[in-house]
């Protein structure tokens, strides 16, 4: 999933013998994106003074850009890897629907520590929780894999096959005739292609075939996103 706006959040992790407080900004990232000197959220201004930047390539694609903008040593630099670890764990688990988050910039701009009770676990959990809140408030959008699909079908079955594909949220890209068969070219979300082989065989009496290959990631329609989030939240509640 990816974002459309920037969002700020903070979290205090406090237990007996443990303390960590993290303030951060989460936003979508694209290559070469500059860091502004200041952000404004809810009437508050956040000045940014970049001390260091770490780019983390993600195993599932895209990257996390982690920016240290902590002023006046409010958090020791030794706790930054723990904050990063907490953010990464939440990106991998997926704060929205359990799917990976990618192409995100996180700016840690403030926080607090305790001379005795602060440790790595406190800052890992504070970073994770602050990221979750900011991510959800940033209006994240879910991406889904889209496949190029070519279907070879007898002309008398073309209407049925096309109707079925359109019911699978397909975008029909073109049609042509080849050796007495019609070739139908479409872009279809991978999610909608489950059991397609069986459905196509049933529609055409086994006289059609298809090939598919990955094309791109695209934003899911808002009604589909709402359903995915709702299903994920009810599953979390059950667990």
Language-model-derived ranges and their functions:
Residues 1-2:
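Short, exposed "boundary/linker" segments that immediately precede the start
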Residues 6-239:
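Accessory interaction regions appended to the cores of large information-processing enzymes
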């Amino acid at each position: 999933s990816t974002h459309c706006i920037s969002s700020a959040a903070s979290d205090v992790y406090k237990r007996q013998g443990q303390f960590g407080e993290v303030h951060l900004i989460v936003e979508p990232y694209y290559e070469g994106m500059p860091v502004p000197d200041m952000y404004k959220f809810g009437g508050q201004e956040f000045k940014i003074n970049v001390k260091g930047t770490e780019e983390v390539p993600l195993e599932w694609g895209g990257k996390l850009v982690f920016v240290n903008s902590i002023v006046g040593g409010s958090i020791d630099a030794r706790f930054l890897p723990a904050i990063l670890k907490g953010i990464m764990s939440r990106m991998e688990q997926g704060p929205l629907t359990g799917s990976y988050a990618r192409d995100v910039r996180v700016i840690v701009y403030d926080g607090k520590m305790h001379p005795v009770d602060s440790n790595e676990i406190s800052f890992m959990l504070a970073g994770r929780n602050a990221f979750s809140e900011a991510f959800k408030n940033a209006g994240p959008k879910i991406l889904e894999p889209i496949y190029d699909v070519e279907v070879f079908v007898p002309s008398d079955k073309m209407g049925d096959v096309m109707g079925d594909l359109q019911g699978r949220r397909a975008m029909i890209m073109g049609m042509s005739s080849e050796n007495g068969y019609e070739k139908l070219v479409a872009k279809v979300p991978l999610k909608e292609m489950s059991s397609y082989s069986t459905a196509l065989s049933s529609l055409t009496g086994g006289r059609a075939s298809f090939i598919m290959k990955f094309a791109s990631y695209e934003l899911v329609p808002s009604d589909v996103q709402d359903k995915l989030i709702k299903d994920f939240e009810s599953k979390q509640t059950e667990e």
